[in-house]
C-alpha cells in the first residue's frame, strides 16, 4: 500500500535565500491545506508452509508450520502529525517455526493434552540518515546535520520463544478440570551500523523479559440450561534492561532487573431464563503484564520503561442475549453492562525528551 491518502493540516513554510540560509515565515496554524501523504509506503511478503498428521494412535493432531516474512515501511510522521519525514524508513524480516500437538485420552480416559511451541527470530533495521528537513508539501531544505529525527542506522534482533500447555480432565458429562501454563522468553539486542549512539536507549545492554502464567479452572455443567466455572491464575514476569539515571530520563543508562508476581481469580456463570433468553455473569481479579514495547520501546519512535508494574483490575460483566430462530430466519439481540476498576494503568503519552526536538511516545 502506498498510503498516499489526503490529510488536512497546516504547513511549516520556509524560504531559501540566495546565500543558502533558510528563513521561516511566521507559522499560521489557521491555514489548513488538503495534502497527500508522500512517505508512507508499506509492503509485506510472506512464505507460509504447514505439514502434519491427524488421527494417529499417538497423536490426534501433530502439525509443524513455517513462516518467513519481509517488510518495508516508510515513516511519514513522528508521534505528532506536524513532524514530517520524507526519507525515514524501517525494514526487516522474521522467521517463525511452530509446533502443535494434540492428544485425546492421554494415558487415561478423558484426559486431553494440547501443546504448542513457536520461535520467532526477527531483525528490524531503522534508518534515518537524510540531512533534509521536509514539510507537508514534500518540499525540503538541506540541514547542517544528518537525521530527520535522530541520526541512526540501527539494527535490532528479537528472539522470542513461546510455549503453551493445556490439559483438560472430564469427569462424566458435568465436570471439567483444566490446567494451563503459558511461558514466553524475549530478548532484544541492538547495535548501530554507523557507530552512532542513541539518546533513548543503550545499544550495549540487552533487553530481556520472561513471562509465566499458570491457570487452574473448574467447570460444572449439569445441563444445557446452566453452567458455572471458577478459576485462578498465577502471573510472574522477569524484566531486565537499560534504565536512565538522569533526571530527564535520557542517557546515563545502567542495567537493572526486576521480578513481579501476582495472583488472580474469578468466576463465571450462564443461565437460560427460558429457551431463547440467556443471562451471563462474570467477575475477575485480572492482571495484564506489560508488553515488550511498553517495557523497551521500539528503538525509534517509542520509549519504554523497564520497571513497569502489571495492570490490575476488578472486572464485572453482566449480559443478556436473545436468540430466536424461525424457519430460515433468526433474530439475535444482546445487551450488557461492564464495570472496570483499574489500578497501575499503563498508558502512553507524548513528550519531548531530553530537551531535544525528538518527540516520542512514552509510557
What are the roles of these predicted feature ranges?
Residues 270-284, 288-290, 311-361:
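Membrane-embedded beta-barrel scaffold of Gram-negative outer-membrane proteins
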Residues 1-80:
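Periplasmic-side early beta-strands and strand-to-turn transitions of outer-membrane beta-barrels
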Residues 5-13, 74-83, 125-134, 189-198, ...:
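Outer-membrane beta-barrel translocator domains and adjoining extracellular loop/strand segments
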Residues 27-35, 79-85, 96-97, 143-151, ...:
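Extracytoplasmic loops and strand-loop junctions of Gram-negative outer membrane beta-barrel proteins
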Amino acid at each position: 500500500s502506498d498510503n498516499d491518502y489526503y490529510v488536512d493540516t497546516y504547513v511549516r513554510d520556509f524560504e531559501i535565500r540566495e546565500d543558502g540560509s533558510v528563513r521561516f515565515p511566521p507559522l499560521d496554524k489557521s491555514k489548513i491545506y488538503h495534502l497527500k501523504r508522500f512517505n508512507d509506503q508499506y509492503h509485506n511478503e510472506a512464505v507460509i508452509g504447514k505439514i502434519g498428521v491427524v488421527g494417529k494412535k499417538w497423536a490426534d493432531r501433530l502439525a509443524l508450520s513455517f513462516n518467513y516474512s519481509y517488510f518495508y515501511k516508510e515513516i511519514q510522521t513522528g508521534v505528532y502529525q506536524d513532524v514530517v519525514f520524507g526519507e525515514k524508513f524501517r525494514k526487516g524480516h522474521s522467521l517463525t517455526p511452530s509446533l502443535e500437538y494434540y492428544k485425546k485420552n492421554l494415558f487415561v480416559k478423558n484426559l486431553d493434552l494440547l501443546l504448542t511451541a513457536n520461535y520467532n527470530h526477527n531483525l528490524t533495521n531503522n534508518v534515518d540518515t537524510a540531512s533534509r528537513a521536509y514539510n507537508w508539501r514534500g518540499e525540503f531544505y538541506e540541514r547542517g546535520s544528518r537525521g530527520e529525527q535522530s541520526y541512526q542506522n540501527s539494527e535490532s534482533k528479537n528472539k522470542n520463544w513461546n510455549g503453551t500447555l493445556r490439559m483438560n480432565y472430564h469427569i462424566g458429562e458435568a465436570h471439567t478440570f483444566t490446567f494451563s501454563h503459558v511461558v514466553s522468553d524475549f530478548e532484544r539486542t541492538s547495535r548501530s551500523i554507523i557507530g552512532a549512539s542513541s539518546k533513548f536507549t543503550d545499544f550495549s545492554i540487552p533487553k530481556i523479559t520472561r513471562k509465566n502464567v499458570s491457570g487452574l479452572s473448574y467447570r460444572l455443567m449439569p445441563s444445557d440450561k446452566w453452567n458455572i466455572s471458577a478459576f485462578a491464575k498465577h502471573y510472574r514476569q522477569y524484566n531486565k534492561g537499560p534504565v536512565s539515571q538522569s533526571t530527564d530520563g535520557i542517557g546515563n543508562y545502567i542495567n537493572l532487573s526486576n521480578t513481579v508476581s501476582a495472583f488472580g481469580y474469578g468466576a463465571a456463570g450462564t443461565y437460560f431464563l427460558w429457551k431463547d433468553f440467556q443471562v451471563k455473569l462474570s467477575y475477575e481479579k485480572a492482571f495484564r503484564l506489560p508488553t515488550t514495547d511498553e517495557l523497551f520501546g521500539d528503538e525509534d519512535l517509542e520509549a519504554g520503561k523497564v520497571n513497569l508494574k502489571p495492570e490490575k483490575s476488578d472486572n464485572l460483566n453482566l449480559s443478556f442475549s436473545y436468540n430466536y430462530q424461525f424457519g430460515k430466519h433468526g433474530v439475535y439481540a444482546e445487551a450488557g453492562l461492564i464495570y472496570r476498576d483499574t489500578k497501575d494503568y499503563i498508558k502512553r503519552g507524548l513528550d519531548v525528551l531530553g530537551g531535544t526536538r525528538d518527540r516520542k511516545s512514552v509510557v
